[in-house]
């Protein structure tokens, strides 16, 4: 008989009960168990820096926001319409002694991306770090089931938004600034039921590498993170109860990761600790070996 523990981060089994949410990108407060977003340690590596994080209300985005706040950064939190999750994230930021603002809206729209950057600079006076993290996914068993509407929505949210918001941010970024893009393990190994999503994540890898070369002479570093199965609101809002029950079992570590286990990658890439890295990806994926 297998011993069952409570904390997924110290367990090799899957502790996620069957569950499903109807709307994307999902509500964190409705998840069981709640994802673990807060890291314990901080070293003020981002002191006096201003960071903009898209999809920052919950999941990996929330964990990144909180990790940045603990490291001394002030944060602008861009999110779609998950107001309750966003308000909680802002409260946690303020509890950690940092300042934050909430900017709701759809980053697949170019005009809104410009607004997000303008609001960030208006409130904080500058922008040092951009984290492109917003994303959506809609599983389909067959390519024929992917509608034109779904295809456009997935690409507009996952990759078009990165072009739009980065274009808006670049006039404010300077030497020493950092851009960190969220990709996925699916960019490297594909996914039979997330064909359009995996395609956008592959595009993000190419975007990151190309942009890093383009901006290297300006002293702006561009890197990315390609997580494996992480317990975020996108999971119960994407998959059936049965799929959620199995989520994360297939990686060598035998469990899904917590958002806080990914956040340190973003802190590293945003800070001077990674000053000799650009065009690179980190892979917190539970031990899956991939060809990078």
What do these predicted regions represent?
Residues 171, 213-217, 275:
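Alpha-helical segment proximal to the catalytic Tyr-Lys
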Residues 10, 114, 122, 137-152, ...:
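Conserved mid-core segment of classical short-chain dehydrogenase/reductases
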Residues 144-163, 180, 204, 253:
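Catalytic Tyr-X3-Lys loop
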Residues 124, 163, 172, 255-284, ...:
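C-terminal substrate-recognition "lid" of short-chain dehydrogenase/reductases
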Residues 6, 11-16, 31, 38, ...:
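Short C-terminal tail/terminal secondary-structure segment
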Residues 193, 217, 229-251, 291-292:
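A glycine/serine/threonine-rich, flexible loop-to-helix segment
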Residues 184:
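Residue(s) in the substrate-gating loop at a strand-loop-helix junction
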Residues 166, 200, 208:
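Active-site helix of classical SDR
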């Amino acid at each position: 008989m297998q011993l069952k523990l409570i904390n997924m981060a110290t367990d090799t089994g899957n502790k996620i009960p069957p569950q499903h949410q109807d709307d994307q990108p999902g509500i964190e407060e409705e998840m069981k168990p709640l994802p673990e977003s807060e890291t314990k340690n901080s070293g003020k590596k981002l002191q006096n820096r201003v960071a903009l994080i898209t999809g920052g209300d919950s999941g990996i985005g929330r964990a990144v926001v909180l990790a940045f706040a603990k490291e001394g950064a002030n944060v602008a939190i861009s999110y779609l319409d998950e107001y309750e999750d966003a308000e909680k994230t802002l409260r946690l930021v303020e509890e950690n002694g940092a300042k934050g603002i909430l900017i709701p809206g759809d980053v697949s729209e170019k005009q809104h991306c410009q607004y997000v950057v303008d609001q960030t600079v208006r409130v904080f006076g500058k922008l040092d770090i951009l984290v492109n993290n917003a994303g959506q996914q809609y599983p389909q068993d067959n390519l024929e089931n992917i509608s034109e509407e779904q295809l456009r929505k997935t690409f507009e949210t996952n990759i078009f938004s990165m072009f739009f918001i980065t274009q808006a941010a670049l006039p404010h970024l300077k030497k020493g600034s950092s851009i960190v893009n969220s990709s996925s393990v699916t960019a490297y190994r594909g996914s039979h039921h997330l064909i359009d999503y995996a395609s956008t994540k592959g595009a993000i890898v190419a975007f990151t590498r190309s942009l890093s070369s383009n901006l290297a002479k300006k002293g702006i570093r561009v890197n990315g993170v390609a997580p494996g199965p992480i317990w975020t609101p996108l999971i119960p809002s994407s998959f059936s109860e049965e799929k959620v029950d199995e989520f994360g079992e297939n990686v060598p570590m035998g469990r899904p990761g917590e958002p806080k286990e990914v956040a340190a990658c973003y802190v590293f890439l945003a800070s001077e600790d990674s000053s000799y890295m650009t065009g690179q990806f980190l892979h917190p994926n539970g031990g899956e070996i991939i060809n990078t």
